[in-house]
């Protein structure tokens, strides 16, 4: 009997060792069973990405799905935070908006490229005259943000867009900017953002109260193109990468990550290699261009009370110097 128990114990130890080697030694990370059905869109790699040490969880599915978003929120703690980094008091808004979307898939069903090489394209004026368009278009995944245009700037920033992050005040409203091959991702910071999306999808009159500037009054994208970003991604950017406090002093406005840092965080979860373009700012000349498009100058950046640009620049400097990412617009 004793020998039988010893054999069972040794078998258990061996099984644990094998599983440990499979799941961790090859960097194919453990994922919760509730998410398994959504994992087939992220091809595992045999080597760790350079930035692996920055993340507590790996291969996290970044988009909310109507069928299980509450389970995912409970699993990763988003049910313990209010917007913008959770959904504790806004779950019904999320449910209604998600019910009108057609998909929460990450990549196209025919996209089976493993270990994706991605570029996150910021909107910085440093992209002017860099002629990086062809280089940018060569990546497996191209992530853009807000209303940074491609049309008319193809030589500088390329033509293709895989993902574009937006919020109601920053989304395109002119149909000439719609690429049917682009997936657009709502980053919700307040319940009004979800209500706005729901009203647009239902064809209702848009309530513009509660926005810091007038949001788009029409939606140029089809429901199949739209996703809602899991607040966990934004929370990771704020607390894990930028190390923002969870409670700010009463005399300070809370700081939130810019869309650019959120986009980089998204890339960390879905890509094996991440390159950046357009994330360098010229603070020494406040008259220098803020974006690669338009006439805005760097002086506007200093007036923004809701972002900690200094913390973000230090974070970018750190991950670039440590070769966790590659900067295409480094002078």
Swiss-Prot record:
Nuclease listed as a keyword: no
Main location: Golgi
Membrane topology of the entry: Single-pass type II membrane protein
This protein's GO CC annotations: extracellular exosome; Golgi membrane; membrane
Key words of the record: Glycoprotein, Glycosyltransferase, Golgi apparatus, Membrane, Signal-anchor, Transferase, Transmembrane, Transmembrane helix
Enzyme class (EC, first level): transferase
InterPro entries, A to Z: Glyco_trans_29, Glycosyltransferase_29, GT29-like_sf, Sialyl_trans
EC number, as in UniProt: 2.4.3.6
Short name of any one Pfam family annotated for the protein: Glyco_transf_29
Subcellular location: Golgi apparatus membrane
Family named by the database record: Belongs to the glycosyltransferase 29 family.
Function, in words: Transfers the sialyl residue from CMP-N-acetyl-beta-neuraminate to the terminal galactose residue on sugar chains of glycoproteins and glycolipids. It's alpha-2,3-sialyltransferase activity is specific toward type II glycan chains (Galbeta1-4GlcNAc) on glycoproteins and glycolipids such as neolactosides nLc4Cer and nLc6Cer, whose sialyl-products serve as precursors for the Lewis X antigen. Critically involved in the synthesis of functional selectin ligands needed for neutrophil recruitment during inflammation and lymphocyte homing to the lymph nodes.
Name of the protein this chain belongs to: Type 2 lactosamine alpha-2,3-sialyltransferase
UniProt source species: Homo sapiens (Human)
Taxonomic placement: Eukaryota, Metazoa, Chordata, Craniata, Vertebrata
